[in-house]
């Protein structure tokens, strides 16, 4: 340099003061998620967490996820308050299907230019998701990276660790022909299929804020946060013998249900057992999407599927309904012939 100008990190696009302001803004909501096992608070180089003493042979279960291009829709509509709930839901729902109780959560927030209000709104949503699932928000990383993201665009990722008793891991190995499948209703598309959602909005020239479905805007339907099933599922596991649980995320019915089925087993789904929520019917019609593609891309109103002995199915529906879930018998497990599909959806 020839002009002897003294440059700062802020001149390069990184505002340390804004980052510190964000930490101060979120301390209160983060504290509300605290669990007794957590040692220390925000600000350490690492977060410390003891294992709950009730576990005899504790097995740690971990998962990481994002919210896909639902985030792009949220940014376009300038609605950042619930995307954090989505982030937590995508992680903790993946843990609980194996019988695990979520313990702690960490987030990663990356942006080109840190907007403290936006980031605080997102992290407040993360804290809300942690409260809903009973896990502690123990830390995170806020990365301001000029040149990597356009303007104040941002991305988020989450990481969660849970614990399950070794003898109580749910891995699908007990699934047998005759088991009944119980569905748990979804709150909407959750956090999957949004690249197709956005394509449909584009080709149909639809403004989601000016389109109404069943008394609320299409934008509200599409940004409805992913349902967190942790407390309902953990309660169910304590009371009934559960053979398998599938979280219907990317890949829909066709790819997620087989993940928990042993070889030689087939899930036979009764499509007449439920009605698609209006948002899915709208997406199918507006995008001229085939039935097969709908079930491969979206949850179509089913957030989770539980497999359990037939004699327990009615009780499961009763318990889940009492927990506030919409639950119903959606199908059965059958023996599959060699080479047969592992999921059959009968109209």
Swiss-Prot record:
EC number: 6.3.3.1
Location in or out of the cell: Cytoplasm
Cystine residue pairs: none
Biochemical pathway: Purine metabolism; IMP biosynthesis via de novo pathway; 5-amino-1-(5-phospho-D-ribosyl)imidazole from N(2)-formyl-N(1)-(5-phospho-D-ribosyl)glycinamide: step 2/2
InterPro entries referenced in this protein's UniProt entry, alphabetically: PurM-like_C_dom, PurM-like_C_sf, PurM-like_N, PurM-like_N_sf, PurM_cligase
A GO CC term assigned to this protein in UniProt: cytosol
Any matching Pfam family: AIRS
Molecular function (Gene Ontology), one example: phosphoribosylamine-glycine ligase activity
Catalytic activity reported: 2-formamido-N(1)-(5-O-phospho-beta-D-ribosyl)acetamidine + ATP = 5-amino-1-(5-phospho-beta-D-ribosyl)imidazole + ADP + phosphate + H(+)
Keywords: ATP-binding, Cytoplasm, Ligase, Nucleotide-binding, Purine biosynthesis
Example of a GO biological process term: purine nucleotide biosynthetic process
NCBIfam families for the chain: purM
Family statement: Belongs to the AIR synthase family.
Protein name per Swiss-Prot or TrEMBL: Phosphoribosylformylglycinamidine cyclo-ligase
Native species: Yersinia pestis
């Amino acid at each position: 340099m020839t002009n002897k100008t003294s440059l700062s990190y802020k001149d390069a696009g990184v505002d340390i003061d804004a980052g510190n302001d964000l930490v101060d803004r979120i301390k209160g909501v983060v504290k509300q998620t605290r669990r007794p096992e957590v040692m220390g608070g925000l600000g350490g180089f690492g977060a410390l967490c003891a294992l709950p003493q009730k576990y005899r042979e504790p097995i740690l279960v971990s998962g990481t996820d994002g919210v896909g291009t639902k985030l792009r829709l949220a940014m376009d509509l300038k609605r950042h308050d619930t995307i954090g709930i989505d982030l937590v839901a995508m992680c903790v729902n993946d843990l609980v299907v194996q019988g695990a109780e979520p313990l702690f959560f960490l987030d990663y927030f990356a942006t080109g230019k840190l907007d403290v209000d936006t980031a605080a709104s997102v992290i407040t949503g993360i804290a809300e998701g942690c409260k809903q699932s009973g896990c502690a928000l123990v830390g995170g990383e806020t990365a301001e990276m000029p040149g990597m993201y356009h303007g104040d665009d941002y991305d988020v990722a989450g990481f969660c660790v849970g614990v399950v008793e070794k003898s109580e891991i749910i891995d699908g190995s007990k699934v047998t022909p005759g088991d009944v499948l119980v569905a748990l209703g979804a709150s909407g598309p959750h956090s999957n299929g949004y690249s197709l959602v956005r394509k449909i909005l584009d080709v149909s020239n639809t403004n989601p804020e000016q389109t109404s479905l069943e008394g609320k805007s299409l934008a509200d339907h599409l940004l409805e946060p992913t349902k967190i099933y942790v407390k309902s599922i953990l309660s169910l596991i304590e009371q009934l013998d559960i053979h398998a649980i599938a979280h219907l995320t990317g890949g829909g019915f066709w790819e997620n249900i087989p993940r928990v089925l042993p070889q030689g087993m087939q899930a036979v789904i009764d499509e007449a057992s439920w009605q698609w929520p209006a948002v899915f019917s709208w997406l199918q019609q507006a995008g001229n999407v085939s039935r097969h593609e709908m079930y491969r891309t979206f949850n179509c109103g089913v957030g989770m599927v539980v497999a359990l002995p037939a004699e327990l199915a009615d009780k499961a529906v009763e318990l889940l309904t009492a927990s506030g879930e919409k639950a119903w018998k959606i199908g059965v497990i059958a023996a599959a012939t060699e080479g047969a599909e592992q999921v059959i959806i009968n109209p």
